[in-house]
Amino acid sequence: LENAGANVLIPRERDCQTAEIIIDNDGCLNTRSAYVENTADKAWMQGNGKGFAHLRSQYTDFENPFKEGTFRTIETIKKGKESIAEWIPEIPQNGQYAVYVSYQTVPNSSDDALYTVYHKGGISQFKVNQKMGGGTWIYLGTFGFDAGKNNTCKVTLSNRSAKAGQIVTADAVKIGGGMGNIARRISEEGATDNLKSSDKT
């Protein structure tokens, strides 16, 4: 379905890369990664509502990182100088990494938000329909990246569009699948069995 152009949301992590880098407009746990805005004819502004924030390495019941932060907005242009948001990661090791973007769907969202991924193999561009899919991770593709932090390894978002006057939103980028971030409790039954086993020894 993806090869045919469909947007497929998979609840299970698709990437076997154990490293994970999250870059967000509200800050990064990896302080060497960076979110940068470049303003031209239109200015980036704070969005109304809640966005993503990477506040902790693990999450428990009822904690939703997509409701704990903010996001940025900008009006699209058809002509003139574009404004760019950049997510610049520090890659821990050479390898293949899945790239995901997060944004918020708002009234008059753009249907062709232009993302560009700079990677080891060159440059790949994607037009994302932000009228849908806000508040989650949207998969762009898997790419090779070299270790370190440089301008040849980043994700950008432009406000250039086929339609002027729409809204593009910028929030977070995730690179790599990681090891999971849901803190799982030990079941009472399992804990009881372990105690019984230890009593017999």
Q: Language-model features: where?
A:
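Extracellular beta-strand elements of beta-rich domains used
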Residues: 140, 173-175
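Extracellular carbohydrate recognition and processing domains
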Residues: 120-150
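Short beta-strands within extracellular/lumenal beta-sheet-rich domains
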Residues: 69-91
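Short, surface-exposed beta-strand/strand-loop-strand elements in extracellular ectodomains
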Residues: 105-124
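Extracellular carbohydrate-recognition regions
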Residues: 13-51, 181-201
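Short beta-strand-plus-loop segments that form exposed binding edges in beta-rich domains
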Residues: 155-167
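Structural recognition of the beta-strand scaffold that forms the well-ordered cores
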Residues: 8-11
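A short beta-strand element within beta-rich, extracytoplasmic domains
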Residues: 83-107
